[in-house]
């Protein structure tokens, strides 16, 4: 039995469940928003492997810290996770992600964890950086709470209460391509790049959740090497790697341990089956 843990349903959840069952394996969904769910000190489930589609993050109205507490409780009961919970946490924390990637030689935007405007200005002065700059919540998801400051006045406004929001300031990587912005999502499953696409938007936030569109991407050997290295140093079995191109260089901005599959399905790439095969492989090992 494989269990998919999620805060809420969605096309990726149900497509993945079907792919697992089509391969002859039982699959259950642990829906953490269910009215029938009771998590007391005796809470446990019967399963051979848990694939969490939850992270710890700032989703506004979604179950986040609660989800994380449930997952950690199940880990304490001896359950096995793909991806590991440590990997999920490290990828949820954008500052931790950037730290790990940069220490392993991957190109990332200059980044600092800030408490207030004074910290933000100190960072800009120390790194000799100019506007614009990006501010984001370290645990933000789906392109939410990502903002651009173009001046001191805007920075002062956007950096207010940063210490209470775990906010980052980050170098702005201008990846505009003509009249649009195009970044890249590459999917790694069990040490293999299985596909990728460009995310296209009229602004610098390209996430599909906030309206970005997709187009096919031919994953070059250089991009493949970057994606595989990201997955390896993050200890990820299933990972979406987000990359910004600029002046012939590639900046890794985020990694995602619960990448959506809808975009790949629209391009005819059956990544649900590949993820299902990965989960079944480690369930049986």
Swiss-Prot record:
GO terms for biological process: protein modification process. It is an enzyme of class 6 (ligase). InterPro entries: ATP-grasp, ATP-grasp_RimK-type, ATP_grasp_subdomain_1, F420_CofF, Rp_bS6_RimK/Lys_biosynth_LsyX. Its cofactor is Mn(2+). Disulfide bonds: none annotated. Mn(2+) 2 binds at residues 254, 256. One of its GO terms (cellular component) is cytoplasm. Mn(2+) 1 binds at residues 242, 254. Binds 2 manganese ions per subunit. It comes from the Archaea. Its EC number is 6.3.2.32. Pathway: Cofactor biosynthesis; coenzyme F420 biosynthesis. ATP binds at residues 136, 170-183, 199. Residues 98-284 form the ATP-grasp domain. The keyword NAD does not apply. It catalyses: oxidized coenzyme F420-2 + L-glutamate + ATP = oxidized coenzyme alpha-F420-3 + ADP + phosphate + H(+). One of its GO terms (molecular function) is coenzyme F420-2 alpha-glutamyl ligase activity. Keywords: ATP-binding, Ligase, Manganese, Metal-binding, Nucleotide-binding. Belongs to the RimK family. CofF subfamily. Monomer. Catalyzes the ATP-dependent addition of one alpha-linked L-glutamate molecule to coenzyme gamma-F420-2, producing coenzyme alpha-F420-3. Thus, caps the gamma-polyglutamate tail of coenzyme F420 with a terminal alpha-linked glutamate. This is Coenzyme gamma-F420-2:alpha-L-glutamate ligase. It comes from Methanococcus maripaludis (strain DSM 14266 / JCM 13030 / NBRC 101832 / S2 / LL). The gene is cofF.
């Amino acid at each position: 039995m494989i269990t998919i843990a999620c805060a809420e349903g969605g096309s990726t959840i149900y497509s993945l469940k079907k792919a697992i069952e089509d391969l002859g394996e039982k699959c259950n969904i642990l829906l953490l928003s269910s009215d029938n769910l009771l998590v007391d000190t005796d809470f446990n489930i019967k399963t051979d492997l848990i694939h969490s589609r939850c992270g710890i993050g700032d989703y506004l109205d979604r179950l986040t810290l609660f989800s994380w507490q449930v997952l950690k409780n199940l880990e304490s009961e001896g359950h096995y996770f793909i991806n590991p919970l440590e990997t999920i946490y490290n990828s949820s924390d954008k500052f931790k992600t950037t730290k790990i990637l940069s220490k392993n030689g991957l190109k990332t935007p200059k980044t600092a964890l800030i408490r207030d405007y004074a910290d933000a200005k100190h960072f800009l002065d120390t790194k000799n950086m100019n506007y614009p700059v990006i501010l984001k919540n370290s645990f933000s998801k789906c392109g939410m709470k990502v903002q651009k400051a173009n001046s001191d006045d805007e920075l002062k406004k956007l950096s207010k209460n940063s210490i209470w929001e775990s906010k980052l300031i980050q170098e702005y990587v201008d990846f505009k391509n003509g009249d649009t912005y195009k970044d890249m999502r590459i999917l790694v499953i069990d040490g293999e790049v299985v596909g990728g696409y460009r995310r296209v938007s009229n602004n610098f936030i390209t996430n599909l959740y906030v309206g970005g569109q997709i187009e096919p991407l031919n994953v070059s050997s250089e991009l493949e090497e970057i994606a595989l290295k990201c997955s390896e140093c993050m200890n990820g079995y299933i990972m979406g790697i987000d990359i910004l191109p600029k002046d012939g260089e590639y900046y890794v901005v985020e990694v995602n341990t619960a990448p959506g599959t809808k975009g790949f399905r629209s391009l005819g790439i059956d990544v649900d089956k590949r993820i299902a095969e990965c989960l079944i492989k480690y369930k049986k090992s």
